Amino acid sequence: MSAPIVIVGAGLAGLRTAEELRRAGYEGGVLLLGDETRPPYDRPPLSKQFVRGETDDTTLRPPEFFADKNIELRLGTAVTGVDTAARTVALADGSTIAYDQLIIATGLRPRRLPGLPQVAGVHVLRAHEDAETLRAELDGATRALIIGAGFIGCELAASFRAAGVEVTLVEPQPTPLASILGEQIGGLVARMHLDEGVDLRCGTGVDTLRADDAGRVSGAVCTDGTEIDADLVVVGVGSVPVTDWLADSGIELADRSAGGGVLADEVGRTSADAVWAVGDVAAWQHDTGVRKRVEHWTSAGEQAKLLVTALLGGAPPTMSRVPYFWSDQYDVKIQALGTPSPDDDLTIVSDDGRKFLAYYSRDGILTAVLGAGLTGQVMKLRAKLATPTPVADLLAAAG
């Protein structure tokens, strides 16, 4: 009996890849390994509907799906290493599994802040278990401190305010999302949070945490010397690729300073024979010649299609590869098409408080569109990013 295709990581990218294998007609064994005990689930609702108690169901596929598709799903199974010469992966229980092809889809883990004391009431948010714990503690919280005003931090701030909890949001950058969207857009996001009563403190970080006599967090001391009272703390300072299990594999990894991850070509093929990478952990080759990770929900499905087609020897499918991501904060959906960069030129097309539209450009050519509260208007511009489009033409057409 031949070895199966083994997918390490039962998140969205791993699931989409398993689905694509069956959709493409692959009839061999498919083994999906996940280190969590929960079947594949949707992460975006964790910081929003789930933590607010509005939904309990984040499952991506019903239990019978895997049996129907003849996909073997093994949960609670941690992979600790890979031998690319022998084509085997090692498990935490000491056993090994042979593979015909290996697909790495291990995703990310939350970045920790070094030096913070280990006290009760301090959380990160990545896994379902994190969200469950956070939701349980939110019920009795009165004042929350969120460290980091990236997407997770901003979404949690909105969810906590909706739950009636006072929120202090601390961010070392000049504005929320500055390193992702730039300071000008970050200022518009900051305005929204300030309007909702968030105590937003930018340009400072957290130096240490305070704890009460019972060992539970009671507040923080910032790097500027100010103090914050809090009975709930969330650290949201980004994530790092889960690649430690590949340390001795010989598979080429991106440098940590460049974002880390598994280096791969434009279809997910890594430096090792019969080894592929997909999803948040994968630094794919892009049209610009740069290899980088794209941490977007829609990218997981797009990459899975390209990878599976290449793995099975087919021609690359014709498909739009315009990146898309979104973030729900309060009653506003923030959407981005393309790749926004703080280094690009920015044109604010419209700004009506909770609704705004902006174009990013480089050398006059559109590189990204970002909008808040303008869902239809943003999505209509997707085609403009598929081919070089001068921003001046868009502005002229809009009158």
Where in this protein do the model-derived segments appear?
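A short, polar/charged loop-to-alpha-helix boundary motif
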Residues: T375-A392
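Glycine-rich Rossmann-fold phosphate-binding loop(s) that bind the pyrophosphate
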Residues: G9-A13, D35, R126-A127, I147-I152
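FAD-binding core/adjacent interface of flavoenzyme oxidoreductases
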Residues: M1-V6, R61-L145, V221-T223, L232-G236, ...
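FAD-site-proximal beta/loop scaffold in flavoenzymes
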Residues: A120-A141, R216, E227-E302, L306
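Beta1-alpha1 glycine-rich phosphate/pyrophosphate-binding loop at the start
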Residues: M1-I71, S159-I180
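Rossmann-like NAD(P)H-binding beta-loop-alpha module
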Residues: T133-L181, I185
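Mid-to-C-terminal Rossmann-like scaffold of FAD/NAD(P)H-dependent oxidoreductases
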Residues: S2-P4, V281-T375
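A Rossmann-like FAD-binding core segment of flavoenzymes
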Residues: E27, L73-A90, I97, A163-A264
